[in-house]
């Protein structure tokens, strides 16, 4: 169980700034970094210039994320010159890549701490080492640890929380670097997961998102085995919990038991993120996804049959090596058939160290961009159509705060994950309320509390 942080009575010894790139797992890692530092006596600042410690928590899933890290590190050189006592640390998946830590140290010698994903829990020790010995730390642990429990955590949100149920991935999709930087699959025990959720409920949290690179593989490494469907049922029975979400699911492992659990468990939200990556069976085979188009559509059909009002989202890669116009057309036709509520779309990006990086039939950049734009146009049309169907309906919304676009309105999300901006009572923040949807927008809904 992770420790919920109470920062009362801690003597302040400095300020820290964290910048995070990447997925929800990285976001939770940053919450743990923040928790550890606050326990040491630091306070968080949102201004780099005010910080005594600056931490970059990096991502390497796509090239663009790495380029952002390089650019931002370059900016820090000036800050370090002005304040030689500033401590700069870089961690995360990008650092876990073979040779990357040494590259960063060579390009940016002013960086004080470089660590990977497997020794994050030791960050306070490394920080103290730098401060006391006036030295730098470069420690990349190649082998993953057993799971570290009871880490302090500084949650960004007071009503919704991420709870990691497993770490790592065993799938080795040919384009993906994750198994190399996050290690093999390791599951937390259901007892530790339940204990963390119960603690969160006692702190006032209403919604939990269960995290893992492939949550459907949960429990296979435990003795005795516990299936993901069984875990969902156990979590659903926790008293006081209002909502449960999870991500990410791998289509090859999404069993009938899991679909049935979502349909029957009242706290499980009717929202499933099911990355397809491509609609072409030929490309899926090259990606090593372990399913084909027919299998994926069969899973979707089962989901829609048991959960008629489900909102489906997905990930799609455009321009994977060898993708022909025919392959891309198959992706478009699958998108139209499934009718996703939303999608994360990406241009294929070569990841050094993955099998796909060596594939010779790379797709030209201009072709990738044209296909990407065509795909986004289709997805946006479908999303607008799906949102339009909400007009006139009454939806349960967890009120998260005031709207970013209009401080006189509130904002929150439906059980299906739709963003709703609505007129309501500010006393409702943190509560579940019923909202009548008045208008559908391209990427959100507008309504009024009833």
Swiss-Prot record:
Pfam families: Radical_SAM, TRAM, UPF0004. GO terms for biological process: tRNA methylthiolation. [4Fe-4S] cluster 2 binds at residues 169, 173, 176. Its cofactor is [4Fe-4S] cluster. It is found in: Cytoplasm. GO terms for molecular function: 4 iron, 4 sulfur cluster binding; metal ion binding; N6-isopentenyladenosine methylthiotransferase activity. Binds 2 [4Fe-4S] clusters. One cluster is coordinated with 3 cysteines and an exchangeable S-adenosyl-L-methionine. Residues 14-132 form the MTTase N-terminal domain. GO terms for cellular component: cytosol. Catalyzes the methylthiolation of N6-(dimethylallyl)adenosine (i(6)A), leading to the formation of 2-methylthio-N6-(dimethylallyl)adenosine (ms(2)i(6)A) at position 37 in tRNAs that read codons beginning with uridine. This is tRNA-2-methylthio-N(6)-dimethylallyladenosine synthase. It comes from Clostridium botulinum (strain Hall / ATCC 3502 / NCTC 13319 / Type A). The gene is miaB.
